[in-house]
Amino acid sequence: MVTIRLSRGGAKKRPFYQIVVADSRSPRDGRFIERVGFFNPIAQGNAERLRINLERVNHWVAQGASLSDRVASLVKEAQKAA
Protein backbone atom coordinates (compact mmCIF):
# COMPACT_ATOMS: atom_id res chain seq x y z
CA MET A 1 0.00 0.00 0.00
CA VAL A 2 1.27 3.47 -0.86
CA THR A 3 1.25 6.13 1.86
CA ILE A 4 1.99 9.85 1.87
CA ARG A 5 3.90 10.49 5.09
CA LEU A 6 6.68 12.46 6.78
CA SER A 7 10.33 11.46 6.55
CA ARG A 8 12.52 13.05 9.24
CA GLY A 9 15.72 14.88 8.49
CA GLY A 10 17.65 17.71 10.10
CA ALA A 11 19.93 17.74 13.10
CA LYS A 12 19.36 16.55 16.64
CA LYS A 13 16.63 18.68 18.29
CA ARG A 14 16.15 20.55 14.96
CA PRO A 15 13.68 18.42 12.98
CA PHE A 16 12.95 18.98 9.30
CA TYR A 17 10.49 16.74 7.48
CA GLN A 18 10.17 15.79 3.83
CA ILE A 19 6.65 14.90 2.70
CA VAL A 20 7.12 11.74 0.65
CA VAL A 21 5.10 9.13 -1.20
CA ALA A 22 6.38 5.74 -0.04
CA ASP A 23 5.46 2.08 0.19
CA SER A 24 4.07 1.48 3.67
CA ARG A 25 6.57 -1.37 4.17
CA SER A 26 9.58 0.94 3.70
CA PRO A 27 11.35 2.40 6.76
CA ARG A 28 10.34 5.89 7.88
CA ASP A 29 13.46 7.57 6.50
CA GLY A 30 14.13 4.95 3.83
CA ARG A 31 13.17 4.41 0.24
CA PHE A 32 10.43 6.57 -1.25
CA ILE A 33 8.74 6.97 -4.62
CA GLU A 34 8.39 10.75 -4.87
CA ARG A 35 9.01 13.83 -2.72
CA VAL A 36 5.96 16.12 -2.76
CA GLY A 37 6.94 18.80 -0.25
CA PHE A 38 8.51 19.69 3.06
CA PHE A 39 7.52 20.78 6.57
CA ASN A 40 9.73 22.82 8.90
CA PRO A 41 8.04 22.83 12.33
CA ILE A 42 10.55 25.27 13.86
CA ALA A 43 10.75 27.83 11.04
CA GLN A 44 11.60 31.30 12.31
CA GLY A 45 11.47 34.74 10.74
CA ASN A 46 10.69 34.70 7.04
CA ALA A 47 11.69 31.03 6.58
CA GLU A 48 9.11 28.96 4.72
CA ARG A 49 7.29 26.58 7.10
CA LEU A 50 5.35 24.40 4.68
CA ARG A 51 5.41 23.68 0.95
CA ILE A 52 3.25 20.98 -0.63
CA ASN A 53 2.67 20.23 -4.31
CA LEU A 54 -1.10 19.75 -3.97
CA GLU A 55 -1.43 18.68 -7.61
CA ARG A 56 0.85 15.68 -7.03
CA VAL A 57 -0.79 14.85 -3.68
CA ASN A 58 -4.21 14.78 -5.37
CA HIS A 59 -2.77 12.60 -8.15
CA TRP A 60 -1.46 10.03 -5.66
CA VAL A 61 -4.68 10.03 -3.64
CA ALA A 62 -6.59 9.38 -6.88
CA GLN A 63 -4.25 6.42 -7.48
CA GLY A 64 -5.20 4.98 -4.07
CA ALA A 65 -2.53 6.38 -1.75
CA SER A 66 -3.51 7.07 1.85
CA LEU A 67 -2.43 10.08 3.91
CA SER A 68 -0.91 9.79 7.36
CA ASP A 69 -2.80 11.71 10.06
CA ARG A 70 -0.18 14.46 10.29
CA VAL A 71 0.11 14.87 6.52
CA ALA A 72 -3.68 15.06 6.21
CA SER A 73 -3.75 18.02 8.61
CA LEU A 74 -0.84 19.68 6.76
CA VAL A 75 -2.60 19.26 3.40
CA LYS A 76 -5.75 20.81 4.85
CA GLU A 77 -3.65 23.73 6.14
CA ALA A 78 -1.99 24.17 2.72
CA GLN A 79 -5.36 24.13 0.92
CA LYS A 80 -6.68 26.78 3.28
CA ALA A 81 -3.64 28.99 2.62
CA ALA A 82 -3.82 28.56 -1.18
UniProtKB/Swiss-Prot annotation:
Example of a GO cellular component annotation carried by this entry: cytoplasm
Keyword Electron transport belongs to the record: no
InterPro entries (UniProt xref): Ribosomal_bS16, Ribosomal_bS16_CS, Ribosomal_bS16_dom_sf
Keyword Ribonucleoprotein: yes
GO biological process entries: translation
Keyword terms: Ribonucleoprotein, Ribosomal protein
Any Pfam family: Ribosomal_S16
GO molecular function, one term: structural constituent of ribosome
Superkingdom of the organism of origin: Bacteria
Family membership: Belongs to the bacterial ribosomal protein bS16 family.
HAMAP family referenced in this protein's UniProt entry, alphabetically: Ribosomal_bS16
Name of the protein described by the UniProt record: Small ribosomal subunit protein bS16
